[in-house]
């Protein structure tokens, strides 16, 4: 099922560890920094963070991240190049396109602090499999060349991640609502 912000908090990658470290550091400075001081006051900073799913952009080339198989597939098809996907066809992860990503940042940052129930928020749009990506890309790029050859090490990392995220808190607290679903992301 969909996971919330308090689940999957024991990452198996340095990337995940660093993301959580930054969240904890932000929470510390926002609530606890300098609390032994006579002049202690909570709220030194107004810390807010978003946990993004895999991001897809038609303009920004992917840089080899583990969720980049989807945008790599798209960019290879647009360039008429063969793409070998490194995850299993049924691998399912959450994604969103860059427009919704940017909109989520703007919405969270412009929301008054007293409207927020937490500091860390999940966002997302759709959760689909690698074969779903291939199929929709083939719909728009009839001559695309996409094959699958699983990289077991990368697959094991992906297998430790959630297939979908619950972003109800973002919807409730700051009216996050993705404009793009899987189908209209590719039009």
Task: Please report, for each region that a protein language model flagged, where it lies by residue.
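C-terminal substrate-binding subdomain of Rossmann-fold SDR/epimerase-dehydratase oxidoreductases
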Residues: 81, 86-89, 94-187
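A conserved pocket-lining segment of Rossmann-fold NAD(P)-dependent short-chain dehydrogenase/reductase
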Residues: 8, 42, 49-64, 72-96
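Glycine/proline-rich active-site loop of Rossmann-fold NAD(P)-dependent oxidoreductases
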Residues: 20, 43, 55-71, 98-99, ...
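Active-site Tyr-X1-5-Lys
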Residues: 10-48, 77-79
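Active-site pre-Tyr helix/loop in NAD(P)-dependent dehydrogenases
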Residues: 2-8, 14, 53-55, 92, ...
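Short amphipathic helix/loop within the catalytic HATPase_c
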Residues: 29, 73, 137-141
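Short-chain dehydrogenase/reductase
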Residues: 4-7, 11-23, 63-71, 94-95
């Amino acid at each position: 099922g969909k996971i919330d912000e308090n689940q999957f908090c024991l990452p198996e990658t340095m990337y995940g560890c660093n993301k959580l470290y930054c969240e904890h550091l932000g929470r510390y400075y926002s609530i606890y920094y300098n609390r032994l001081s006579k002049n202690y006051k909570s709220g030194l900073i107004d810390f807010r963070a978003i946990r993004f799913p895999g991001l897809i952009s038609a303009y920004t080339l992917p840089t080899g991240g583990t969720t980049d198989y989807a945008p790599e597939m798209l960019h290879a098809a647009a360039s008429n190049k063969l793409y070998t996907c490194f995850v299993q066809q049924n691998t399912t992860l959450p994604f969103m396109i860059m427009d919704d990503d940017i909109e989520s940042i703007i919405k969270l940052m412009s929301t008054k602090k007293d409207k927020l129930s937490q500091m860390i928020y999940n966002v997302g749009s759709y959760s689909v499999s690698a074969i779903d990506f291939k199929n929709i890309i083939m719909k728009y790029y009839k001559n695309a060349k996409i094959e699958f050859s699983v990289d077991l090490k990368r697959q094991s990392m992906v297998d430790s991640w959630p297939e979908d995220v619950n972003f109800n808190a973002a919807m409730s607290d700051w009216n996050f609502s993705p404009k793009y679903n899987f189908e209209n992301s590719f039009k």
